[in-house]
Design a protein with these regions (language model features):
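Outer-membrane beta-barrel porins/channels
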Residues: 8-11, 17-357
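Surface-exposed strand-loop-strand hairpins of Gram-negative outer-membrane beta-barrel proteins
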Residues: 1-6
Length: 357
């Protein structure tokens, strides 16, 4: 069945060239997110009407970034920029089905948590040959949040873990979550009249990412220490990844006339290791995309595009790294809309600041 829901990632950017050498930028984006729910009859869905919880395993994660950047342009070629990042995170995870054993019926919910980080980068351009290159580093951001946790299976009378869960839930502590650091490299150059080639390479430090809610962690440690999960004697995480993610996109863009332009691109993503979490059961992807851009006047444009993804096959595991299933032959489609305006004659596009999150 289809377990992935539709979701969108809005992005907005504003750049003001305050003086010949100094600029200010404001960027809003949603760097990470998830929206998925299992349905139908499977080991990820609880259909037993006797139990006090029903439905399918699901995850919803929302993050938002507001970036305030300051740029210094010593000449027409170089741009040095850095700034602060205000980030919010909230999420819901519901585990359902026999796959999760004693965690069947577990709920994890957070309110919106706020934290601050930073980013910095450098850009270089040669306008005469349409060359633009930039490197942007985004630092990790740590969040500490009070989360709601509930172990639904232990509400069943005579459940053997009910006394232990009662002890665990009588205390509480902060749940820590750190969104990963990343590096973006963008490059563009003219290859013939009105035609450019472009490329992007991105690295995300997912191998250090983990989510272990406080009460979830305490129960997992008990299970590991009592040899109930022999391969995890120190407990396990609700979500973690084995490897860092590397992705790349290459393409060609062409200006057909004063009003119309277009592009085609090919993309590849390594994923973050295999096996993967049941809450995001894919290992990377290949993609192809195309887009068009219409400029009714010199000072604004409208762009649209579509991209098709072949999602990588993956073996899914639970937090305890027990086998949960194999996911194969999956795909996805993405649509994009882009609108831009130039407010002054020396206003330049915020490409030098761009950090696709």
């Amino acid at each position: 069945g289809d377990m992935a829901s539709d979701y969108y990632f809005p992005h907005a950017a504003l750049k003001i060239q305050a003086t010949e050498h100094f600029s200010v930028g404001l960027i809003y984006d949603q760097p990470f997110g998830a929206d998925a729910e299992y349905s139908a009859n499977s080991a990820f869905v609880e259909n037993n009407n006797i139990l006090p919880f029903q439905g399918g395993t699901s995850v919803t994660v929302d993050t938002q970034n507001l970036n305030l950047l300051f740029g210094y342009q010593p000449n027409e070629n170089w741009n040095l920029y850095a700034g602060a990042v205000y980030q919010t995170v909230d999420g819901i995870v519901l585990l359902r089905g026999t796959t999760y054993s004693v965690f069947n019926g577990y709920d994890f919910r957070t309110g919106e948590d706020e934290s601050v980080g930073w980013l910095a980068g450098v850009a270089y351009q040669i306008p005469e040959i349409a060359l633009k290159a930039s490197v942007t580093y985004r630092a990790e951001i740590e969040h500490k949040m009070n989360a709601y946790e509930n172990f639904g299976s232990t509400t069943i009378p005579q459940h053997p873990l009910t006394p232990l869960i009662s002890t665990i839930t009588s205390t509480n502590s902060e749940t820590k979550l750190t969104t990963p650091q990343s590096i973006n490299i963008d490059f563009q150059t003219g290859i013939m009249a009105n035609t450019v080639a472009f490329a992007n390479v991105r690295w995300v430090d997912w191998s250090k990412f983990k989510v272990q809610p406080y009460q979830f962690g305490k129960l997992s440690q008990y299970l590991g220490q009592n040899n109930l999960v022999p391969n995890k004697p120190n407990g396990f995480n609700l979500i973690d990844y084995k490897e860092d993610q590397i992705s790349a996109t290459v393409g060609v863009g062409r200006k057909f006339n004063e009003r119309w332009g277009g592009n085609v691109s090919v993309g590849w993503d390594s994923g973050a290791g295999n096996p993967v979490t049941t809450l995001g059961p894919t290992e990377g992807f290949w993609s192809v995309g195309t887009g068009v851009r219409f400029s009714p006047a010199e000072n604004y444009f409208i762009g649209a595009g579509v991209k098709y993804f072949w999602l990588g096959d993956a073996d899914a595991v639970t937090g305890a790294h027990s086998n949960a299933g194999k996911f194969t032959n999956n795909d996805a489609i993405a649509y994009g809309l882009n609108i831009g305006s130039l407010y002054t004659t020396n206003f330049t596009e915020p490409l030098s600041y761009q950090d696709s999150a």
